[in-house]
Amino acid sequence: MLTWVIRVCFLILGGTTGVFSLPALWVKLGIGHILLINNPYTDALIGALIFYLITFWAVKYVEAALNWLEEKLAKIAIATLIYGGLGLFVGLVIAFFASNALSQTNIPLLNSVVPVILTLVLGYLGFRIGISRRNEFGNFVNNRNAKKKTPEEEQTEEKSKKTYKILDTSVIIDGRIADILATGFLDGTVVIPLFVLAELQHIADSSDTLKRTRGRRGLDILNRIQKEDSIQVEMYEGDFEDTPEVDSKLVKLAKVMGGIVVTNDYNLNKVCEFQNVPVLNINDLANAVKPVVLPGEKMTVLMVKDGKEHNQGVAYLDDGTMIVVEDGRKFINETIQVEVTSVLQTSAGRMIFAKPS
């Protein structure tokens, strides 16, 4: 069906081209006075025939290009297409009025070449601005249409916005977020952006075995979260095409939605704090629920290896907390009692320093 549609379009294009182009050719060839040849019907027939013959070679390329375009458009959210189309329309309207003004001049370059360039450039810029700023336009329209709210309603709305929890790739692969959500410690709606899902799929398709395993684990965690009846899950289909990095997209999305980024990525945590974007690091939660260890407290540990500094030994608690023991190297593979001297607490984890008691 598509093949015949393409051929019909070529026939129409060929007939139109023949009507407007062939009369000048007949005059140059010296046969313009022959009415049987130089008439619109013959010109249209010859042009259509030539273009129809071209379709036997060109139709497969045109069909492949249309299929490629259809696949690309199918992956784009409808809101993106609408705002991109509106931006393109505005750009073309501006180019039309500018071209009309330039056509009044007697300078050949300004009234012929420049209007074409303006149409292409302004049309492209309008399309790109419409896509990249679609979220801001949407918020502007919503704010214009919104009725005047009371302070209580504004407070309730602000509170509901803060209930959006936007998951990043690292926290999904980690897996602990599924258990945290199931227990109800995090309220509100879980937002999973499509660009995060795409990154997970890319990791799951990796040739590296470790990456492939991590990606598939992340997809399994997402399926588990979606199947939980007590968890509200929303998919965000938009994208920020002017921003290639997923972390930067998450920060922008949190600003647009007024939500909170949930992560265990130390660098993303710092970026969110720098840009005043609310962020929850589940490593902070994990550290907060660990048993409190105070300086002077004694504990029994198994020395497993030597430390980085001279004569240091390293042991671990059951929850994985590292204990650095001064002068503990000589006790490797032995169970000894140590006394806590200090505790270092960060978002990356907790480290305990001790000495043999």
Swiss-Prot record:
Task: Please indicate which superkingdom the organism of origin belongs to.
Answer: Bacteria
The Enzyme Commission number assigned here is: 3.1.-.-
Domain TRAM positions: 292-353
Which CDD domains does this one have?
Answer: PIN_YacL-like
The answer to whether UniProt assigns keyword Chloroplast to this entry is: no
Q: Which GO terms describe its molecular function?
A: metal ion binding; nuclease activity
Pinpoint the PINc domain residues: 166-278
Q: Which Pfam families match?
A: PIN
Top enzyme class: hydrolase
**Which parts of the sequence bind Mg(2+)?**
229, 247
> Family assignment?
Belongs to the ycf81 family.
State its role: An RNase.
List the protein's name: Uncharacterized PIN and TRAM-domain containing protein Lin0266
Q: What is the lineage of its organism?
A: Bacteria, Bacillati, Bacillota, Bacilli, Bacillales
